[in-house]
Amino acid sequence: MSDPDAPSSTGDSPTRPNGPRPNVLACPSPTTARFILLVVATLATGLFVGVFVHNMVLGDRWQREVVACASGLPYAEAEGADVLTTWQAWAECTADAEHRRAIFAFAGLAVAAVAAFVIFKRSPRRLERRRRLRPADERFAAARQRFTELSHAAGLTRPPTLMIGPATQRDAFSYGLPGSQRVVMPVAALIRPQCPEFTALAAHELAHVARRDVTVAWAAKSIGYAVAPLLLVPALLAVLTGELSLLTDYVWRAVLLGAVVTLTRAAILRSREHDADLLAARMGSSVPELSAVLAQMPDMRSRHLRHLIANHPYAHRRIAVLDNPASIARASFVDAAAAAFLAGLMPYLIDLVVVPLLTGTAGVGVTDLVAAAVMGPLVGATIGLASWRACLVSRVSGAAVHRGPVAAGVLVGFLLGEAASLAQYGPGGYHPHPSPLLLSVTALSAVGATVATVGLGELWADAAGRLPSARSFWLTAVLVPGLLFTATLWAAMKVQKSLEWGGWGMASLTLTDYFARPTMVVGTLVLALAAAWPIWLARRDTVTPAWLLESGTGRSWPATDRPAARFTVIAGLLAGTCGAAVIAVFRALAGAAADDAQAAQRLYSYVFLAGAVAAAATITVECFWPGRGAGAALISAPVAAVTAMAGLVVINTLLGGTLTWTFAYDIGRQPIGLALLSQTFALSIVAFLPRGRRTSRRIGLAAIVVVATLAILAASAVITARDVLVPIAAKSIASGEPRPLDEDVACGSCRVIGPVTGHANRQYW
């Protein structure tokens, strides 16, 4: 969550900046996406509680059934064992036990959802009884009339119900369910409906209603009340069953999850207050009136972390935001860390449901895709909206956009979230404790996706002057980062699980084979188009879009840096060409492959080489086009990878191989998905380096030398390490007769060579 309540670095009495006033409400704040993330995390906690109850009640039975299934399997330790058949037999045998566990998990999810809904539904009545609230009667007819006028000014066709409390009440607030929302005003303000204080308070609360965030606020509070009892259930069961040794491992996870939920909920409530202040200043009240009312409120200037859990921002901070709205258009470390932490909890928890539910079916392998499809759009929308809005508003305010704190927050959040995942705790847990090295795979890929998201935000901010409305910008800010995080996290989780279950041999196969699927290829190409389109739109100067200005005159909106944009493609082509040159030199020195096993090793090594030159192009583009280069690398990375493999096709043809469209397509698409993962890992390396201010004049010979040098070094390193990167263990193959894929199964640390066996062009690799 962004930290809008942190003390200002420029003092507590900021002055309004000269120039136009940006309309920061043109783009939605990340509040809604963050709220959805909070809801999903709460439901995921319910999943865990359901599984934990199953393990405590039926854990022994589940263990006996699973052990019986395992003991009946025909394990073979010899090289070439039919692992796939063994796994399928085990899945079919344990299907009933796993389905039973899935039922418990869904029951826990239902309990979490019902508990939060009941608390939310009963909150208005309980609040009215506790605070003695009642509708304003005829004594306040003038106030009701003025309130109705302000409601129409706020765009509300049906004014909310005006409520009052006891005479001692000093605060105004809004509450209620959808369709029956109410606004509470202090009696002292109601008796003077024409005074600025009444106008400011009423306009602020009506802004909440107009923005439809009253439901979000009270639902967020209800979720907080529902999470605490849920987290107590496992601890209570452990005490009742005498499993006290489990408490130590559980308590720190529960406390950490509870703390993050509390921080996220508080951030949702704080950010909505700033949004309501800014909207109220434009519909019935004004900045001076609101500032005067806020100045009369009790203020706290905590130098500690107390402001992070406050539901309302401090008065001095609200005044500062009214004076300078651009100050809230940013994403912070805490914002990114909270979103990443909640997302890091989800994959293993989703596994606990999806794996048992699909055990015994052909769809059991989609668990990573389901997890990525759930958390990718949520994290992408949260970080994308915050960072893209910051990039956009910075064009008007002149403030710098800092990606380092956001990237650091994502790194810390994912590491803590994965390590604290409740799915790793409890008897009969599905996943073991992975090592920190394995956890870092997904975390680093998320960092790279974050840097690329900020880079895309810079590119689309350049093109904002050509967009017809704010909606065109913020919808893209939701969809494109969501796709980027979904694809990146799915790939990273696939690699992480491959390392965990089968070591580097399985991970190597995943990296070079699995990511060549059409879905990954199409996703990578769509992301490249999402980076190319704003560069094309921003090819000419324009002016500040009217929808981005609240007041003031628009300024010149500079076009994108054309030499840098051209270098994006040039860097990819040059890096790929250097990679192809390394392949040609290696083929000339090493000669033809001795057998099918060596041919397979070479082919998959070339795929790794394509990923390596994609990383080289990414680093170069980001270094010579700081900020925007991270987004533009979505173009240069696949261009570099495809160019390198196109070089392989040319070499194959020159040596006498057969050139067909099928062969060219199969070879060309092989590294595209890997290029995306290589790009994110490369960006994670440069994420925390200071960004320079290089201009187009410096993109010349130096840039060409750098990209060529990096590409040659990376490609040469892959060729040198091919025995490590692509371990091969092939059976003897009858000459002249290609063997089916399932007859060439590698050992646990080696690779399947079936796709290469009998290939017409294998002798030219």
Where are these regions (language model features)?
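Active-site recognition of the HExxH zinc-binding catalytic motif
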Residues: 185, 200-208, 212-213, 217, ...
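Active-site-proximal gating segments in proteases and membrane effectors
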Residues: 152-182, 262-271, 275, 280-339
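Short pre-active-site segment immediately N-terminal to the catalytic Zn-binding motif
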Residues: 187-200
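Post-HEXXH active-site segment of zinc metalloproteases
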Residues: 212-242, 290-294
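Solvent-exposed, extramembrane regions of membrane proteins
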Residues: 205-209, 311-312, 320-325, 594-600
